[in-house]
């Protein structure tokens, strides 16, 4: 895997944050966590949701569409996705986007 350069990482983080805010506005039960991982040399994204929403087709379509977009733009450096930390764990320092955090910090 090729190391993500600083400017590319910042652009990727901005894109992820904007997407995450839109997703939690649409799917109010969703929480999105993300952070850069030195180990994986890319950004890790965790989509956190209650089990009853695991079969929401619109949600999965929107998440997969974003994943495809990121793969086209960043190739091997594209972020890695997981659901409810099934594939990897994020640290306590991960950014968290959810309705509560977005509402309390709109700036």
Which residue stretches match the model-derived regions?
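Charged, low-complexity intrinsically disordered segments and flexible loops
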Residues: 103-107
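Well-ordered, non-membrane alpha-helical segments in soluble/globular domains
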Residues: 13-19, 56-68
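Short edge beta-strands and adjacent turn/loop segments
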Residues: 24-46
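Short secondary-structure junctions
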Residues: 20-31, 71-75
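Short, internal active-site loops enriched in acidic
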Residues: 38-41, 48-50, 85-89
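N-terminal presequence-like segments and adjacent domain-start helices
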Residues: 1-14
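A short amphipathic beta-strand at an alpha->beta junction
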Residues: 68-100
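A short interface-forming secondary-structure element
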Residues: 42-64
């Amino acid at each position: 895997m090729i190391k993500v350069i600083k400017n590319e990482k910042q652009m990727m983080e901005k894109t992820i944050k904007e997407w995450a805010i839109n997703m939690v506005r649409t799917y109010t039960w969703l929480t999105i966590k993300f952070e850069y991982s030195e180990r994986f040399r890319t950004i890790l994204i965790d989509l956190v949701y209650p089990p009853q929403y695991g079969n929401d087709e619109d949600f999965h379509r929107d998440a997969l569409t974003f994943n495809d977009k990121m793969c086209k733009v960043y190739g091997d450096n594209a972020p890695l996705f997981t659901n409810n930390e099934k594939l990897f764990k994020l640290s306590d320092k991960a950014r968290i986007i959810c309705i509560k955090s977005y509402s309390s910090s709109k700036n």
